[in-house]
A protein has these predicted regions:
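Conserved beta-strand->loop/alpha-helix structural units within folded catalytic cores of enzymes
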Residues: 17-18, 33-36, 128-131, 138-140, ...
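Active-site rim elements
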Residues: 4-15, 117-124, 187-196, 300-308
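A generic secondary-structure signal for well-formed alpha-helical elements
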Residues: 25-33, 112, 138-143, 209-216, ...
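Active-site/ligand-binding neighborhood in enzyme catalytic cores
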Residues: 95-245, 253-260
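N-terminal glycine-rich phosphate/pyrophosphate-binding loop and immediately adjacent elements
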Residues: 1-113, 119-120
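C-terminal segments that line or cap access tunnels to active or ligand-binding sites in enzymes
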Residues: 186-193, 251, 260-279, 284-368
Length: 368
């Protein structure tokens, strides 16, 4: 059995979370200390797998794998080996023109020290000047292959291309030309990952609210537990979850300043229903709230509308074995020019009776 995630990936920086969040996680049975042993930090080292780059023939003239990521993106995967090549070797192996390879090395050896800016003005400068201006004007980069590599090096760190990043943002995410660094501090390694991602948290929440839905005393025990969906909406439950029911309108039952109840309208099986509640928590994508709650204060509605999400596509692929990944040394492969811009092994987490793949002869899950 292979388990992976299809939505929210991991619990990010829990040690910086508020006490309310930490208390909630403890209350639903999430043991944060358990992840220090559940996550196999030595997996990638044992199998010689690190950050690499795959260049395709369509864009770069040849299909080529280079043992260097050219950016910091893969560094968020805990335990992943770094690039095997020096900057000089990596630039020499890139399928670029002679001029392009020279410019690539200039970028890889660049950084804030390349800016002719006084120390006192540096922070203002890097926050107000663009990363691509730095590449093109400060470093003199005009090779299209190098610029394409830079454009993809920021990947999913913002809701915009690296072309629109400030120098400060590019430095923060480790875009091409800024030295690899720890994306998360040592107190917050990126290891807080259930095999099914944060669905593990959601399942633990449901179990806390509706005890009869599954067997298991804590979140780890629920990893392989089967949920009895018939328990979710029983009339006798203190809490009932109704699936396939889309809320289309929420409003106060009267003047918002004095109303004692809220009215919720939802659609189920193409029929409209309305329920009343003393309180309603809008636990959804916040930008949708102004469209659902008609009597919000305008200032609050405007603030909620200002939020953005970036188009973001993950593809999960099951493989019969992962010899190709191991033999090529691929833990994470950056792929500038491909529709999928990165390919990576799933996180090596074993818990709750679930065992992550250990042998390349066995099936595995990769993310793209």
């Amino acid at each position: 059995t292979c388990i992976s995630y299809g939505g929210s990936q991991s619990i990010v920086e829990p040690k910086n979370a508020s006490q309310v969040v930490l208390d909630l996680l403890e209350d639903i049975g999430v043991d944060l200390k358990r992840f220090t042993t559940a996550y196999d930090i030595g997996f990638f080292k044992r199998h010689g797998m690190g950050g690499v780059t795959y260049f395709n023939e369509e864009i770069f003239g040849e299909d080529k794998l280079v043992q260097h990521p050219y950016c910091n993106y893969p560094n968020y995967v805990e335990g992943l080996l770094g690039g095997r090549l020096s900057h000089e070797e990596a630039a020499a192996q890139a399928p670029l023109s002679k001029k392009g390879r020279k410019q690539l090395l200039r970028v890889l050896n660049g950084g804030l020290h390349a800016l002719d800016v006084q120390e006192a003005d540096l922070q203002d400068y890097i926050n107000s000047h663009s990363y691509f201006d730095y590449l093109q004007k400060t470093l003199g980069v005009d090779d299209p292959g190098v610029l394409r590599m830079a454009r993809h090096s920021g990947l999913d760190w913002g809701s915009f291309s690296a072309e629109l990043m400030s120098i400060a943002q590019a430095k923060s995410c480790g875009a091409m030309g800024f030295p690899p660094k720890a994306v998360y501090d040592e107190d917050n390694p990126y290891i807080y990952h259930f095999p099914d991602g944060n669905a593990g948290v959601a399942r633990a929440l449901v179990k806390k609210l509706i005890s009869g839905v599954a067997e298991g005393r804590n979140a780890e025990a629920l990893v392989l537990a089967r949920f009895n969906y018939a328990e979710l909406d029983r009339p006798g439950n203190p809490v009932r979850l109704r699936l396939n029911s889309t809320v289309v309108n929420v409003k106060h039952g009267g003047d918002p300043a004095s109303a004692s109840e809220a009215l919720v309208t939802y659609i189920n099986d193409n029929k409209s229903f309305q329920v009343r509640g003393r309180n309603v928590v809008m636990a959804c994508y916040n930008m949708m709230i102004p469209h659902l709650v008609s009597d919000l204060p305008e200032k609050q509605a405007a603030a909620l509308r200002s939020q953005t999400k970036s188009p973001f596509v993950y593809t999960t692929v099951g493989l019969r074995n992962w010899h190709a990944m191991k033999d090529s040394g691929i833990g994470v492969a950056m792929s500038p020019g491909n529709m999928h811009q990165a390919v990576l092994m799933d996180f090596p987490v074993s818990m709750g009776g679930y065992k992550f793949t250990e042998s390349p002869d066995k099936p595995c899950v990769i993310q793209m």
